[in-house]
């Protein structure tokens, strides 16, 4: 079954510059006949070496409400939660001729409404972000099974040993500081840690 369609060449393929490099931007969306929540978005491919340098994905806005159960693991009886928008941005950076994951950000927007109340809805925006501080390819091994968590785990139900002193002054990153500057400072902190 063909889930995705490409539009006319003018709509699908564009060119843009990312990190001083020319990239081809390829847009994709699901076929009109498909009525389930699939992803749509853009892939940013380096024009010179065909490497994927960035991707922007989102649940098709027309069907994002149907995807609510994908993101809500446990529901309460008092509240109704509906997905409004789900967007992911992933970027890759070249290091020693190989592209590695550099930055991930996910933005999830929900409408939250108290059941049996007419005018009680509000918006909830939750997001996550990960930035690669250091790439180390020496002696890389997979995580052991006991070190992995099931994908459906609810973090607030999990008991972790948290070292409040580990991050030191970086425990909270101020909004006004640029993320790249903070990562540089944080990288030097990580370099000091002995294993």
Can you describe what each PLM-predicted range is?
Residues 19-20:
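Short acidic/glycine-enriched loop/turn segments that link adjacent beta-strands
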Residues 8-9, 97, 148, 167:
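Short linear sequence elements within intrinsically disordered, low-complexity coil regions
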Residues 11, 23-138:
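Gly/Pro-enriched, hydrophobic low-complexity segments
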Residues 2-9, 13:
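Single conserved hydrophobic/aromatic residue that forms the stacking wall/gate
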Residues 107-195:
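Secretory-pathway-linked proteins and extracytosolic
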């Amino acid at each position: 079954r063909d889930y995705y369609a490409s539009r006319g060449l003018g709509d699908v393929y564009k060119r843009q510059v990312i990190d001083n490099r020319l990239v081809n931007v390829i847009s994709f969306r699901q076929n009109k006949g498909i009525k389930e929540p699939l992803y749509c978005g853009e892939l940013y491919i380096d024009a010179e070496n065909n490497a994927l340098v960035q991707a922007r994905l989102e649940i098709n806005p027309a069907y994002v409400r149907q995807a609510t159960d994908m993101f809500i693991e446990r529901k309460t009886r008092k509240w109704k939660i509906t997905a409004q928008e789900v967007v992911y941005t992933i970027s890759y950076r070249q290091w020693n001729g190989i592209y590695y994951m550099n930055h991930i950000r996910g933005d999830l927007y929900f409408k939250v409404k108290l059941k049996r109340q007419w005018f009680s809805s509000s918006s909830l925006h939750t997001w996550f972000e990960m930035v690669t501080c250091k790439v180390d390819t020496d002696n890389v091994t997979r995580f052991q099974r006991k070190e992995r968590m099931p994908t459906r785990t609810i973090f607030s139900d999990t008991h972790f040993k948290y070292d409040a002193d580990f991050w030191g002054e970086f425990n909270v990153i101020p909004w006004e500081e640029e993320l790249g500057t903070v990562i540089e400072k944080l990288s030097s902190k990580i370099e000091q840690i002995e294993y």
